[in-house]
Structures are given as structure tokens and as C-alpha cells.
Regions:
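Non-catalytic, topology-defining segments of multipass membrane proteins
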Residues: 1-246, 312
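Cytosolic/matrix-facing juxtamembrane and C-terminal tails of multi-pass cellular membrane proteins
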Residues: 265-309
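Small-residue-enriched core segments of transmembrane alpha-helices in multipass membrane transport
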Residues: 250-259
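Short alpha-helical catalytic segment bearing the HExxH-like zincin motif
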Residues: 111-120, 249, 265, 297, ...
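A generic hydrophobic-helix recognition signal that picks specific residues
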Residues: 115, 158, 260-261, 290-298
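Hydrophobic alpha-helical segments with strong N-terminal bias
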Residues: 106, 252, 288-289
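Transmembrane alpha-helix/helix-exit interface in multi-pass inner-membrane proteins
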Residues: 159-162, 258-270
Length: 312
């Protein structure tokens, strides 16, 4: 339970009292997600520091877990990249030390922090995390998508255009939504592979095109510029330190799109063919799923499509 949560016992009684009899069990399970032991933030700060950050830095103090999540991810990436740059020779090839650092980096970055960061960034893309009254708030709010996202295989500056502007506006309906699943056989592994390949191969060109068609010219220009900077940074790091490049960015640039598209395919696997645009018929809510504690209750995907700025 966070610093700003209401009294769970009183709130639970109110929700259960208001529930219809056939909804009561679902509400009981949902309360486990609402008041269960959160696990997004592994690194916690002293309670007084957390309270100060929540009230002085954040636009909504309830978003403190998002901030702590980004802090822990940034600290880990800085630590891991420092080890790679200092312990591995620039001109060195494959070595036991390089393999060891690669394994550790992948385990922590993906197995431990992967869901936490990706879903944290996902919700932060819909919300204003840092209060506008804080100097440099616009830059601070952009850091997860411009800097951190690259280490999870998401090119700088593309996530907002893809997810918020395209996916939610077009509501999973292909062909406007390049990540739409309604045109695929969603019980077919081959269809999943085609879905992933289609997105990975076409997204860099389609997203700016989509923004132009929707007359979001500023976003189109930003997407093209950030993509150019993304590939320039790739080239520069690879030229400077190939091993650090492959450990920190190269591997994730392949795994990231696969993981994201496989996740989206699963979230939009069950669709009502009679009304594929209805938010209640294009995705699911997963109640009391263990991963909800790691992902800001991302299992509540119907709720998210109904109100994308709300964390369930």
C-alpha cells in the first residue's frame, strides 16, 4: 500500500456493499490487485524523501511508484553501462567476461526490470508525471521515452506516436493501426510471426506517414528526427565500443519489438467479431494475475482502453 492510499478495509467494504451479487467475486479478486503488495519499485527511498518527491515533484502524488521505477531503471543502466565501458576492451572480441556481463545485463534488464519499465513507460506516456511547475518538466517527462526506452528496444521518440496517437486513436483496427490484431488469425503462431515482422519492418516509415495523414506534422517531424538520432547513436556507440553496443542496445533492439508485439497480440487476442471497435469486445481484463503487481495493474486492459490516463 502506498503513501496516499485510502484505508483499504473501509474502501473494500464500500465496494463490496455496492457490488451486485453476480459481481461480488470479481470485486473480491480486484481488491487483491488494488491493495496487494506492490512490486514495481524494488528500490525504495526513505519515507520522508518519497513523500517530498510525491508532493513537490509529481503532477499527481499517486504516481510515485512510476517515478521510483524510472529511478531504479536509470540507476541500473548507468551501472551496467559503466561496467561494460570500463571492464571490456574497446577492441576486444568475444570473451568470458563479455559473455558474463551480457548475461547479467539481460537478466536484470529484461527478466527483472523489463515488465516494470515497459509498463511504467506505457502509463507515463498517457499521463503528466512531473508537475509543469517544476523547471525542466517537459524534458524530465520525455526522458523515459527519449533515453531509457532505447535500452528496451524502443527507438527514441516513437512510442508516444505509436501507442497513444495511433493505437488508441485507431483502437486496434487494422489498417490504420499498424499494431491492430483484428485482421489476423489470433490462434496461429505463424500469424503472430507475421504480425511481429510486419510491425518491425514497417513501423519506421508508417508512423511518420500516419502522423502526416492525421495532420500531426510536428509529431511527424519529431519522429523522423528522433529516428535519425537513434540510428546515429547506434552507429557512434558501435564504432566506439562494439561490445557495449551489443550488450546494451543491439540485443534489445531485436528482443524489444518482439516482446512488445507479442504482448499486444495477447492483449488483443480475443475480439468480438460483431463489434471489433467496442472497448469491451477488443481486449480483456485479467483479474488477480500475478504480473499485475509488477506492471501497475496492466492486466486491466479494458479499463485502460476506456480511460487511458487512469492506472487501474
Amino acid at each position: 500500500m502506498g503513501l496516499l492510499d485510502p484505508d483499504p478495509a473501509e474502501h473494500a467494504r464500500e465496494l463490496l456493499a455496492a457490488a451486485k451479487p453476480h459481481h461480488r467475486r470479481a470485486v473480491e479478486l480486484a481488491l487483491c490487485d488494488l491493495y496487494g503488495r506492490r512490486a514495481e519499485a524494488i528500490v525504495r527511498l526513505p519515507r520522508g524523501v518519497e513523500r517530498a518527491l510525491a508532493h513537490r515533484l509529481l503532477h499527481d502524488p499517486r504516481d510515485l511508484p512510476l517515478l521510483l521505477n524510472f529511478i531504479q531503471c536509470g540507476l541500473w543502466l548507468a551501472f551496467s553501462l559503466t561496467l561494460q565501458l570500463t571492464l571490456l576492451p574497446r577492441d576486444g572480441g568475444l570473451s568470458a567476461r563479455a559473455v558474463g556481463l551480457f548475461v547479467v545485463h539481460v537478466v536484470v534488464t529484461w527478466a527483472i526490470l523489463g515488465q516494470r519499465f515497459i509498463l511504467g513507460m506505457h502509463f507515463a506516456a498517457h499521463r503528466t508525471l512531473i508537475s509543469p511547475r517544476v523547471p525542466g518538466a517537459a524534458l524530465l517527462n520525455a526522458l523515459p521515452q527519449l533515453v531509457l526506452a532505447n535500452f528496451w528496444g524502443m527507438p527514441a521518440g516513437m512510442y508516444y506516436l505509436h501507442h497513444v496517437v495511433m493505437h488508441h486513436a485507431s483502437n486496434n483496427l487494422f489498417s490504420w493501426d499498424l499494431s491492430g490484431t483484428n485482421s489476423y488469425r489470433r490462434d496461429s503462431p505463424l500469424a503472430l510471426l507475421h504480425y511481429i515482422a510486419n510491425f518491425a519492418l514497417h513501423t519506421f516509415l508508417y508512423l511518420p506517414y500516419y502522423a502526416v495523414v492525421k495532420r500531426r506534422f510536428g509529431l511527424a517531424g519529431f519522429a523522423l528526427g528522433s529516428t535519425g538520432a537513434y540510428f546515429a547513436a547506434f552507429h557512434a556507440l558501435h564504432a566506439y565500443h562494439p561490445a557495449a553496443f551489443w550488450i546494451s542496445l543491439g540485443f534489445s533492439s531485436v528482443l524489444g519489438p518482439v516482446a512488445l508485439m507479442a504482448g499486444n497480440f495477447g492483449q488483443h487476442q480475443f475480439i468480438n467479431p460483431a463489434d471489433p471497435a467496442d472497448n469491451y469486445g477488443l481486449t480483456v481484463n485479467l483479474v488477480k494475475a500475478p504480473f499485475n503487481m509488477l506492471t501497475f495493474n496492466d492486466g486491466y486492459h479494458i479499463v485502460h482502453h476506456l480511460n487511458s490516463v487512469r492506472i487501474a
